[in-house]
Swiss-Prot record:
Reaction(s) catalysed (UniProt annotation): L-glutamyl-tRNA(Gln) + L-glutamine + ATP + H2O = L-glutaminyl-tRNA(Gln) + L-glutamate + ADP + phosphate + H(+); L-aspartyl-tRNA(Asn) + L-glutamine + ATP + H2O = L-asparaginyl-tRNA(Asn) + L-glutamate + ADP + phosphate + 2 H(+)
Oligomer and partners: Heterotrimer of A, B and C subunits.
HAMAP family per UniProt: GatC
Species for this entry: Streptococcus equi subsp. zooepidemicus (strain MGCS10565)
A Pfam short name: GatC
Originating gene: gatC
Protein name: Aspartyl/glutamyl-tRNA(Asn/Gln) amidotransferase subunit C
Ligase is among the record's keywords: yes
Superkingdom of the source species: Bacteria
E.C. code: 6.3.5.-
Keywords (A to Z) from UniProt: ATP-binding, Ligase, Nucleotide-binding, Protein biosynthesis
Biological role: Allows the formation of correctly charged Asn-tRNA(Asn) or Gln-tRNA(Gln) through the transamidation of misacylated Asp-tRNA(Asn) or Glu-tRNA(Gln) in organisms which lack either or both of asparaginyl-tRNA or glutaminyl-tRNA synthetases. The reaction takes place in the presence of glutamine and ATP through an activated phospho-Asp-tRNA(Asn) or phospho-Glu-tRNA(Gln).
UniProt GO molecular function: asparaginyl-tRNA synthase (glutamine-hydrolyzing) activity; ATP binding; glutaminyl-tRNA synthase (glutamine-hydrolyzing) activity
Enzyme class: ligase
Length: 100
């Protein structure tokens, strides 16, 4: 299937892109080759072949939603350079502290 330069210009305009004449010609040629390659897939006999929607055999693999004890606070805070009221103190990243 041949993609015309006019079609390339039309899609470029819809996408708010601009191309030179040489780029438009090159895109038309390249896109035509891509479409031709994809159309070759229509010639493949897939009779009796199951439809494949994903290559992954497993779906929705998640751990059980079970509450577990967290890390001991003393252990967590032993390497913290600055802390205040059981919080880790970090440098401000907003000038005024922000509205958060």
């Amino acid at each position: 299937m041949k993609i015309s330069e006019e079609e390339v210009r039309h899609v470029a305009a819809l996408s708010k892109l601009s191309f030179s004449e040489s780029e438009t010609t090159e895109f038309a040629t390249t896109l035509s080759k891509i479409v031709d390659m994809v159309e070759l897939l229509n010639e493949v006999d897939t009779t009796g072949i199951a439809i494949t929607t994903t290559m992954a055999d497993k779906k929705n693999i998640m751990r059980a939603d079970i509450a577990e004890a967290g890390v001991d606070r003393k252990f967590l805070f032993q390497n913290v350079p600055e802390k205040e009221n059981h919080f880790i103190k970090v440098p401000a990243i907003l000038d005024d502290g922000g509205d958060a």
